[in-house]
Structure formats: structure tokens, C-alpha cells
Amino acid sequence: ENNGAINIYANNSFAFSMLGSVGHLVNNGTVTIADGVTGSGLIKQGDSVNIEGVNGNNGNNSEVHYADYTLPDVPGSSVSVAASTPSSDGSQNKLNGYVVGTSSDGSAGKLKVNNASLKGVSVNTGFTAGTSSTSVTFDNVVQGSNLTDAETITSTSVVWNAQGTTDASGNVDVTMTKNAYTDVATDSSVNTVAQVLDAGYTNNELYSSLNVGTTAELNSALKQVSGSQATTVFNEARVLSNRFSMLSDAAPEVANGLAFNVVAKGDPRAELGNDTQYDMMALRKSLTLTEHQNLSLEYGIARLEGNGSDTAGDNGVTGGYSQFFGLKHQMAFDNGMNWNNALRYDVHQLDSSRSVAYGDINKTADANVKQQYLEFRSEGAKTFELREGLNVTPYAGVKLRHTLEGGYQERNAGDFNLSMNSGSETAVDSIVGLKLDYAGKDGWSANATLEGGPNLSYVKSQRTASVSGAGSQRFNIDDGQNGGGFNSLATMGVKYSSQESALQVDAF
């Protein structure tokens, strides 16, 4: 660990040497290679060895100390690391892998060396925490004579461009210039958020976190910042609506047309993604209007508990409740024909969390979200009795659905909190399906449904959002949801009941 100054006066000498894999190399001070010295450098074992500290080579530029603690033992066999090979004439010192550390106060690490090539030298972006300027110059980051290849100095981040120059004294200066996020990002889905971030550039945690090393990392970070990947909560709400339909349809009649069903946490049927579980109750009241017409009223409520998001960029349910309201009408005709109409309204009030995790960032943004779902379904069906107790019902029809997703304001994630506006989605789907019902005489029964159909029409509004660290400017959200696809549903259930016991298994 170097907390002061290391001066190298001999040829082919090095400031640091790593003998094993369990130690640390730390440079919080300066390293000076004396005039006339050749073949020397920072690390004896080569560039792949990590040096920590303010003037290390890992780009972190954070002061660290290990000497106050018990130093690790050197293992019996040393690690094999490829060493840098000196030039044939031994005339140049090796700086490849050296990172010029910069700090929020505008200072930069300095290296004194003569007869050296600056190929492989880079500059980190620690300075961005202290300034909102998009162009900053650091003087004399490398001092000495016969310094070559200053123009090859690079930035540790794709967001910044480093331009090295040699001044009149022979020392090397570096100017760091910010690139536009729109010029660096290659994913078209993040273009609008990149534009907003460019317009609102300043020095805060959000912008510092975007100083990543590769274009792929920037694309991923911008997607997480925009919230476009946070889709699980509302998708799970749709799944929950289907679960209520199944629970209500399977409800056994208690008396006078009243049916009741319940499922509780701990039951495999009461599980959603991200370890979310729920308690759900379903009530159904059936009324006979005429000899050929029936009416059913449905109500249900569910209480949810979950662990939130388990995927970077996505969201997940942490709690909340849902309510379900249904009205069904059936008209029977001769020869087993039926005309079925159904109206549903579901409302979901959910607590959620969104994960933002890239680089050194690990944030959780909490929110309260609301989704309302309205559906009208009309279909014609014909029932065929294959044998006693076994019926098959093919059906076809159309479904109109409208979803309204409320706006929300996130909290607890600082600069990464999103303010999202409301959005809507309207679609018309065709329906073609087949139902199978079996009722045995020994207490066993089974049912299965296979349904599918193409989307006929789809319209959705454009959702926009703003992120706290970039001010109030808004950008478009592209969640990848489009119409024109094929919708499908498959369910199956087996039930056994007797006076002493009951068993029910459902799959979907």
C-alpha cells in the first residue's frame, strides 16, 4: 500500500508486485519514474493485476486502506500472470493499464515519467460528481520528457471522449468531452429518454451512474431509468382476473343458486410470479329468468402479498388488493345451442416496487398503482353429449376489452424516481374454443378449456414519464406491447368429493 511517493531510479523496476491472489495493491499516492530510467512501470506482473486507490489502475479513484488490518498470507504457489514485455531496446517505460484518477473537486492524479508511451492510458470520470460542465481539461496528468502517443489516451466511459495533447513543456494534458447519450445509445427504444437526459444534464447520482464502460451497458441502464421494462405488476393483474374467473366457475353451489369458493396463500393455485401469493374469495348468485334464460351475478376479492421485483428494470407486487364484478346472461335454444353474454369489471389497487440495478447502482423505487379492466364477451356455443356424463362444447364469438392504467409517482429511489402518466388500451379479439366436462358417478369430475383467437383491433395511448434526476421534461415509454397477435388460454381441473373428503387440482 502506497500512501506517499514512490520514486523509481533503476531500469526494469516496478512500483508494485503481486505475489498471490489474496492480497491488494493500493496506490493512494504518487509514482515517479526518474529521468533516464527505461523498461520500468507500475506493475511487475502486467496490466491484468488490479491496483486500488486514488491513483490506481481500476478507475475507481477511491482512497482505500488495508494496512490497519491483518495482511493476508501469501499462498504457497503464486498466481501466473502474463507480464508486459519490454521493448527490444528497453528504451520505453510501460504505462499500459494506467488510469488517471479524477475527483469531484476537479483534481486529477499525476504521474512523473520519462521515455514512455501513453498507449493504454485512460482517464476515469470521478470529476463528473462535482461539475455539470460537459468539457473539462486536466493539465499535466503525465509529466516528463519524451512522452509519446498522447493522442491514444482514452476514457473509461463511452459517454465521455478523452483527447490527450502534449504541451510546450512536454507534459501531457487531457480534455474530457461528454458525448450525447443519443449518439452513443444504439437501442431505438431509449431514444426519447436519451434526448431528455441530454437536455437536462447536470451533476447528480443519476448522471454519474450513466458513465458506464460499454454501449450495451448504456442501453441497459437507459431502459431501466425509463421504466419501460417495468411490466410485471400489470401483467400479473391480468393473470389474477383469469384466476378469479376459474375460481368462480368452479364454485360449488351452497343453496338457492348461491355458490361460494375460496383459495388461500400456501395453495399452489394462489401463486403468481416473483413469489407473490394471494387470498381470494368468489361468490356467485344464479337466477332463472325464464325457462330458457339464466342470469348470474359474480363478486370476488383478493388480497396480495409479494416480495417485489426480482429482475433489474422490472417491477413486482408487494401488496394490495383486487375486486371483481361480473354479470353473465345465457339464453338456451333447441338442439343444445346457447347464446352467452358476459360483462366484467375488475379493479386492482396494488403496491409495487421497481428495481434499478446496474454498475454501482442498486435502488428500489416504491409506488402505488391502479388498474381498471372492463370486458364484454359474446359467444355462441353448442353442447354435444358424447356419452353419459361427458359433454363437449365448441364455441365462437368476440371479446371487447378496455384497460386503464393509472398514473403514479415513485418514492425512495432519489434521482431514479419516476413520475408516470396514465395509459389506456382497447382491443377486440375473436374467440374460438372448446370445453370438456366430465361428471362421474363415483365422485370424480373433470373439466378442460382450450381457447384462442387472433386480435382484430388494438389501440393504446402513449404513456410518458419523467425521472427526478432530469427535471420535469417527459419522455415516451415503449413497453413493447403491440396488437395483431394471437391470444390463447388453456385450463384443466380434476375434482373428487365425497361425504368424508374432497380433492381438487387445477392447472392453467
Task: Please state what every model-predicted region is.
Residues 1-13, 17-94, 107-119, 145-150, ...:
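Surface-exposed loop/turn motifs in large extracellular/passenger domains
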